[in-house]
């Protein structure tokens, strides 16, 4: 009788271990598909990711590059001061989206163009995502929006 209980206990522990392993693998796979890494334009230019990889790119919308087509397709360049990457987006852009403004886009590279499926703009005049601030600081082009310039005006990300 004792041998039977011990055998049954080992079977239950083995089944629980297998179930836990399967659950861990399933959760890990689901999380991996939901994680989108952030890259700056300089990082994308230095080491272009595979076309199948979905990631976020962030920086400033380069002045003079914003082109709104007749359809809902918009093209622009995202820069961090070190490199510029062409972006194409089909859809309605956020109200605060514009040239010299911070943006983060989700999508993938196709033939040297970042095809965005989602475009985010900062939600007020002073906010900029941490990743974008870090990338701009690394390139030496970040200006604190709360700091005043030599003329007494506020610098902002665009320097105006």
UniProtKB/Swiss-Prot annotation:
Record region (Disordered): 141-160
Q: How does it sit in the membrane?
A: Single-pass type II membrane protein
Q: Name one GO molecular function term.
A: metal ion binding
Against Pfam families, the record matches this protein to: CcmE
Transmembrane parts of this sequence: 10-30
List, alphabetically, the SUPFAM superfamilies matched. Heme chaperone CcmE
Q: Which InterPro entries match?
A: CcmE, CcmE-like_sf, NA-bd_OB-fold
A Gene Ontology CC term for this entry? plasma membrane
Q: Where does heme bind?
A: 123, 127
Ranges facing Cytoplasmic side: 1-9
Compartment(s)? Cell inner membrane
Swiss-Prot/TrEMBL GO biological process terms? cytochrome complex assembly
* Keyword terms: Cell inner membrane, Cell membrane, Cytochrome c-type biogenesis, Heme, Iron, Membrane, Metal-binding, Signal-anchor, Transmembrane, Transmembrane helix
Mapped to this chain, the residue ranges on the Periplasmic side of the membrane are 31-160
HAMAP family reported in the protein's UniProt record: CcmE
Q: Which family does it belong to?
A: Belongs to the CcmE/CycJ family.
What does the UniProt record say this protein does? Heme chaperone required for the biogenesis of c-type cytochromes. Transiently binds heme delivered by CcmC and transfers the heme to apo-cytochromes in a process facilitated by CcmF and CcmH.
Q: What is this protein called?
A: Cytochrome c-type biogenesis protein CcmE
- Gene source species: Dinoroseobacter shibae (strain DSM 16493 / NCIMB 14021 / DFL 12)
Q: Gene name? A: ccmE
């Amino acid at each position: 009788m004792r041998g039977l209980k011990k055998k049954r206990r080992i079977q239950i522990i083995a089944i629980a271990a297998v179930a836990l392993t399967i659950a861990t693998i399933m959760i890990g796979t689901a999380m991996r598909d939901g994680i989108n890494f952030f890259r700056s334009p300089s990082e994308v230019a230095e080491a272009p990711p595979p076309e199948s990889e979905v990631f976020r790119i962030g920086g400033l919308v380069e002045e003079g590059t914003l082109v709104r087509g007749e359809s809902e397709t918009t093209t622009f360049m995202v820069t961090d001061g070190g490199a510029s990457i062409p972006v194409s987006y089909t859809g309605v852009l956020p109200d605060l989206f514009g040239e010299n403004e911070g943006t983060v886009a989700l999508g993938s590279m196709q033939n040297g163009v970042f095809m965005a499926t989602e475009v985010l703009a900062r939600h007020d005049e002073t906010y900029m995502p941490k990743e974008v601030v870090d990338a701009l600081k690394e390139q030496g082009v970040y200006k604190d929006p709360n700091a005043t310039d030599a003329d007494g005006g506020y610098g902002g990300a665009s320097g105006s």
